[in-house]
From Swiss-Prot:
BP-aspect Gene Ontology terms: dendrite morphogenesis; lysosomal lumen acidification; lysosomal protein catabolic process; lysosomal transport; lysosome localization; lysosome organization; neuron cellular homeostasis; positive regulation of dendrite development
Taxonomy, superkingdom: Eukaryota
Subunit text: Can form homomers. Interacts (via N-terminus) with MAP6 (via C-terminus). Interacts (via C-terminus) with the vacuolar-type ATPase subunit ATP6AP1. Interacts (via N-terminus) with AP2M1 and CLTC. Interacts with TMEM106C.
Annotated keywords: Cell membrane, Disulfide bond, Endosome, Glycoprotein, Lipoprotein, Lysosome, Membrane, Myristate, Phosphoprotein, Signal-anchor, Transmembrane, Transmembrane helix, Transport
Family annotation (InterPro entries): TMEM106, TMEM106_C, TMEM106_N
Protein name per Swiss-Prot or TrEMBL: Transmembrane protein 106B
Membrane-spanning segments: 98-118
Lumenal topological domain residue ranges: 119-275
Tissues where the protein occurs: Expressed in cortical neurons (at protein level).
Encoding gene (name): Tmem106b
One GO CC term on file: lysosomal membrane
Organism from which the protein derives: Rattus norvegicus (Rat)
Pfam families listed in its UniProt record: TMEM106, TMEM106_N
Species classification: Eukaryota, Metazoa, Chordata, Craniata, Vertebrata
Modified positions (Phosphoserine) in chain numbering: 34
Length: 275
């Protein structure tokens, strides 16, 4: 009994020591196994999403992979791209430069539009009488004058101008002796000038029949009478109409058919009303 009692504590101590070592090892093994399980779990999670490379027509270029990655075609609206905050695409360069350039281009185009489309004057210059053809009615003591006049119309605009009509009348001694109207005449191009002739038929009769004796008097070589030429030119551009009027006093020979040169016509244009 003594030996058995003496060995029991030793045995128990050994067993306790063994159990302590075993428990310590078990704890270490438990920690290791738990870490292994965690790593296995992570590797299992990663293994659920294997690396797949998409090539060919079934994929498109990934916009966040610098053009080197591919994503399945048809999933562009389902996938979300994560872009780093420091990505250059989130901070575009030269934004101020682009804005200033856009503003400058807009201002330049606006200035050019205003410059070219701004309405400028249309100049009408009465050149004079080009020709006068005379005929008489001796029974009624009437004089018929077909007077052809010349106008220069200058378009100072950078777009075409339409000459809609020309209205003219001739006065003798404050009495209107002839009228004429021409419609849909011509178009004048940008920065262009056109010369237009128009004829006004006139009749001198009734209370002015005394002029018949003057115009048919054979002792006088030149039978000049003073006529006032009035002309109104109507032009149109961009739906806007504009009228320009001119008045000139002109010598006309009522004794014979006469063709005037432009220089002579200018010389005869001496009696003008004071403005």
């Amino acid at each position: 009994m003594g030996k058995s009692l003496s060995h029991l504590p030793l045995h128990s101590n050994k067993e306790d020591g063994y159990d302590g070592v075993t428990s310590t090892d078990n704890m270490r093994n438990g920690l290791v196994s738990s870490e292994v399980r965690n790593e296995d779990g992570r590797s299992g999670d990663v293994s659920q999403f294997p690396y797949v490379e998409f090539t060919g027509r079934d994929s498109v270029t990934c916009p966040t992979c610098q053009g080197t990655g591919r994503i399945p075609r048809g999933q562009e609206n389902q996938l979300v791209a994560l872009i780093p905050y420091s990505d250059q695409r989130l901070r575009p360069r030269r934004t101020k430069l682009y804005v200033m350039a856009s503003v400058f281009v807009c201002l330049l185009l606006s200035g050019l539009a205003v410059f070219f489309l701004f309405p400028r004057s249309i100049d009408v210059k009465y050149i004079g009488v080009k020709s006068a053809y005379v005929s008489y009615d001796s029974q009624k003591r009437m004089i018929y004058l077909n007077i052809t006049n010349t106008l220069n119309i200058t378009n100072n605009n950078y777009y075409s101008v339409e000459v809609e009509n020309i209205t003219a009348q001739v006065q003798f001694s404050k009495t209107v002796i002839g009228k004429a109207r021409l419609s849909n005449i011509t178009n004048i191009g940008p920065l262009d000038m056109k010369q237009i002739d128009y004829t006004v038929p006139t009749v001198i009769a009734e209370e002015m029949s005394y002029m018949y004796d003057f115009c048919t008097l054979p002792s006088i070589k030149v039978h000049n009478i003073v006529l006032m030429m009035q002309v109104t030119v109507t032009t149109a551009y961009f739906g806007h109409s504009e009228q320009i009027s001119q008045e000139r006093y002109q010598y006309v020979d009522c004794g014979r058919n006469t063709t005037y040169q432009l220089a002579q016509s200018e010389y005869l244009n001496v009696l003008q009303p004071q403005q």
